[in-house]
C-alpha cells in the first residue's frame, strides 16, 4: 500500500491479485438507445437499463467482496470536473463539435456548459444531449438549431463506456490512453484522459502510450507475463496501431516482447479478449475453433530497433516469449455449435482476480464447467442485459492495480 492506503497503481500481468479496478455503472446513456440508433452505437439490442444496473451492481459487489477496490468512472469524472477548470474545458471541448453544430451553436452550447454544475456536466458528457434539451432557443441565429429535430443528438451518448477496458489499460506502472476505432466510441478516451490527468488519485501517473492516430483498443491487449504483451489486430486495432504500441512500450522499457495476433475482422471477435483470456499464470481459455489456427508475429526489442519474426502458432510463440515450456489451454471440449454460442455470449471473456480465480457470465454453462474441471475457480455473474453490447467481465473492467507476478 502507498501512503494513502491505496494499492500502488499498475499491472504487469492478467492474473496478479487484483487490488483496484475502474468500472462504469450503466446510466442514462443506455436509455438513449433506440431501434434507429442501436447499430450505430454498437449495441445488438435495447438493454433493460434497470436490470443492467442490477447486474452491474452485483458484479461490483462481488469484486468488493473479494477485496477489490471498485472505482466508478462517473464518480471520478464528477470529482474531476468539480475540482479542475482545465478538466472542464477539455471535456467540453471534446464534446462540442463545431463541425457538426456550426460555429454559432457550438459557441453558445460551450458557454452554457461552462456554468453547469459538475454532476450535471458529468451526466451530459456521458449520456449526451438532444436538441430538445438545449438551453438555446429555437429562434437562435443558428441554422443547425432551426433545422434539426428535437430528438436528434447535439452531443452523442456514450453507451459503450460500460466497457472500460478499451479506452485505457495499465502496463507496468504506467497508463496507456488508447485510440478507439469507431466514431461511436472515439470521445470515450477524452473522459479517461481527463480523469488520469486531473484526478488526485492518479496524480503523477505517467503515460505509456497516447494520442496515436492508428487505433489500439484495450480489449486487444493481453499482458501475458511481465515484459510480454499480446496485441490482437482485427476489427478494431490495426497493424499500424500495434506497431506504434510496440515501439512505445519498448522505448519506455515496459516490455521486451510484443506478440501481434491477427484475428478475424468480425463483430463476434472484435477484440482478442473475445476469443482468448488468461485464467492462470500459465493457462488461457480460448475459443476452440481457432485454437489450432491462431498465429502471432513476434516483435523483439533490439539494441538498434526491433526485429519481427513469424507468423508462428500463437500458443508456441506465447510460451517461448513467456519462458515456459507450454501454455496450458483449458479444453472446453465443446461441439462447434455450443462453442460458437458461448463465444458469442462472451464465454472466453473472463476477468482474473488472482491466479486460477476468474469472473465469468453464468450463462456460459459448458465453458464454466470445463474451467472448474481444470481447477479454475469460477465466480459467476448474471449478464443477460450487460451482454447486449457484446462484452463480458474483462471488457467491463480496467484493472488499475494488480500485485506483480
Swiss-Prot record:
Encoding gene, per UniProt annotation: arcA
Keyword annotations: Arginine metabolism, Cytoplasm, Hydrolase
Species, as recorded: Rhodococcus jostii (strain RHA1)
Keyword Amino-acid biosynthesis applies: no
Main location: cytoplasm
Annotated active site: 395 (amidino-cysteine intermediate)
GO MF entry, a single one: arginine deiminase activity
GO terms, biological process: arginine catabolic process to ornithine; arginine deiminase pathway
Pathway: Amino-acid degradation; L-arginine degradation via ADI pathway; carbamoyl phosphate from L-arginine: step 1/2
A Gene Ontology cellular-component term: cytoplasm
Protein known as: Arginine deiminase
Enzyme class (EC, first level): hydrolase
Lineage of the organism: Bacteria, Bacillati, Actinomycetota, Actinomycetes, Mycobacteriales
Classification via HAMAP family: Arg_deiminase
Cleavable signal peptide: none
Reactions the enzyme catalyzes: L-arginine + H2O = L-citrulline + NH4(+)
NCBIfam families noted in UniProt: arcA (TIGR01078), PRK01388.1 (NF002381)
Cellular compartment(s): Cytoplasm
Gene3D superfamilies attached to this UniProt entry: Arginine deiminase, L-arginine/glycine Amidinotransferase, Chain A
Transferase is among the record's keywords: no
Amino acid at each position: 500500500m502507498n501512503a494513502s492506503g491505496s494499492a500502488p497503481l499498475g499491472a504487469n500481468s492478467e492474473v496478479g491479485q487484483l487490488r483496484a479496478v475502474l468500472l462504469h455503472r450503466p446510466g442514462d446513456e443506455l436509455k438513449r438507445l433506440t431501434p434507429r440508433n442501436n447499430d450505430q452505437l454498437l449495441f445488438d439490442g435495447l438493454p433493460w437499463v434497470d436490470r443492467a444496473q442490477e447486474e452491474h451492481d452485483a458484479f461490483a459487489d462481488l469484486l468488493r467482496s473479494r477485496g477489490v477496490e471498485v472505482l466508478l468512472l462517473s464518480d471520478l469524472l464528477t470529482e474531476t470536473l468539480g475540482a479542475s477548470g482545465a478538466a472542464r474545458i477539455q471535456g467540453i471541448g471534446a464534446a462540442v463539435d463545431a463541425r457538426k453544430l456550426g460555429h454559432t451553436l457550438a459557441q453558445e452550447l460551450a458557454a452554457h456548459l461552462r456554468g453547469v454544475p459538475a454532476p450535471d456536466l458529468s451526466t451530459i458528457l456521458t449520456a449526451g444531449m438532444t436538441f430538445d434539451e438545449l438551453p438555446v432557443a429555437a429562434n437562435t441565429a443558428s441554422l443547425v438549431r432551426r433545422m434539426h429535430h428535437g430528438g436528434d443528438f447535439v452531443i452523442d451518448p456514450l453507451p459503450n463506456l460500460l466497457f472500460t477496458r478499451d479506452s485505457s489499460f495499465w502496463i507496468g506502472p504506467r497508463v496507456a490512453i488508447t485510440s478507439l476505432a469507431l466514431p461511436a466510441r472515439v470521445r470515450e478516451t477524452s473522459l479517461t484522459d481527463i480523469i488520469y490527468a486531473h484526478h488526485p488519485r492518479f496524480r503523477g501517473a505517467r503515460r505509456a502510450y497516447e494520442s496515436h492516430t492508428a487505433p489500439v483498443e484495450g480489449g486487444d491487449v493481453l499482458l501475458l507475463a511481465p515484459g510480454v504483451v499480446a496485441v490482437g489486430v482485427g476489427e478494431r486495432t490495426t497493424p499500424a496501431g500495434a506497431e506504434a504500441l510496440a515501439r512505445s512500450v519498448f522505448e519506455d522499457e515496459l516490455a521486451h516482447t510484443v506478440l501481434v495476433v491477427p484475428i478475424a475482422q468480425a463483430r463476434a471477435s472484435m477484440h482478442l479478449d473475445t476469443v482468448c483470456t488468461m485464467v492462470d499464470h500459465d493457462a488461457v481459455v480460448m475459443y476452440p475453433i481457432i485454437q489450432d489456427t491462431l498465429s502471432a508475429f513476434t516483435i523483439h526489442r533490439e539494441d538498434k530497433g526491433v526485429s519481427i519474426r513469424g507468423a508462428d502458432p500463437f500458443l508456441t510463440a506465447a510460451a517461448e516469449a513467456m519462458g515456459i515450456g507450454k501454455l496450458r489451454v483449458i479444453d472446453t471440449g465443446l461441439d462447434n455449435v455450443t462453442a460458437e454460442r458461448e463465444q458469442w455470449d462472451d464465454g472466453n471473456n473472463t476477468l482474473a482476480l488472482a491466479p486460477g480465480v476468474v469472473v465469468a457470465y453464468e450463462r456460459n454453462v459448458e465453458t464454466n464447467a470445463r474451467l472448474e474441471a481444470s481447477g479454475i475457480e469460477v465466480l459467476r455473474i448474471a449478464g443477460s442485459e450487460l451482454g447486449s453490447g457484446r462484452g463480458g467481465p474483462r471488457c467491463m473492467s480496467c484493472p488499475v492495480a494488480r500485485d506483480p507476478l
